[in-house]
Amino acid sequence: MDRKLLARRIAEESIVLLKNEDHMLPLKEKKEIAFFGRTQIGTLYSGNGSGGANVAGCGTILEECENCGIRPEPLLKGFYEYKINEERVTEEDEFDWTKVSEMVNSGIMYEIFGKYRAPLDEYEVPGTLIDQAAEKTDTALIVIGRNSGGEECDRHLSEDYYLTNSEESLLKEVCSHFTNVVVVLNVNGLIDLSWVRKYANIKSLLFIGIPGEEGASALAGILTGETNPSGKLAVT
């Protein structure tokens, strides 16, 4: 079997549908959806270090959803693309890659990359963009991401296992504007989910974990009904 087809099949059979009320999924064909969360573009495919993989050319969650006929609300899409690109340019400008070999030899690479790093804050979406999106669609999709832990940098409870303050704020804003909300968990470990009960608008909840190179494509197929999710949690 082709490597990409195998990767997609594994991802499809691993994604767990934790909640689906009022037949929220599959999404209606060509329905416009308000996408939120930095991980829709900064999609997490694999771990780091020895758990890392070559994911060059892999589609993001946003891209693969578009490929499957889901229409992202354009103003929000533009906002997130701008913020992500701005962040990438800043990081590239500030890092001197000519120093890498020197850093490895000195041991400072461990000091930089071998320590715990908290999840990145969610972007603060302007209220006007949320209002405008809510006028066009009643459905939103939020992607929550986690990519930390291992080798003396195990995850923390505050703002890691539990939601960050910026994630809490985003959820509150989205659930106060949209009747139907889908939450996708693109996380490398369990997180607290008690907050789901606080928001009746969260109709669907999907755990995709760190799904590999074809994970975003597999998720898009599930959201549109092309594939039925068949994954199970290890503890249930």
Q: Positions of the model-derived regions?
A:
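C-terminal non-catalytic regions of proteins with extracellular/luminal or membrane-system context
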Residues: M1-T236
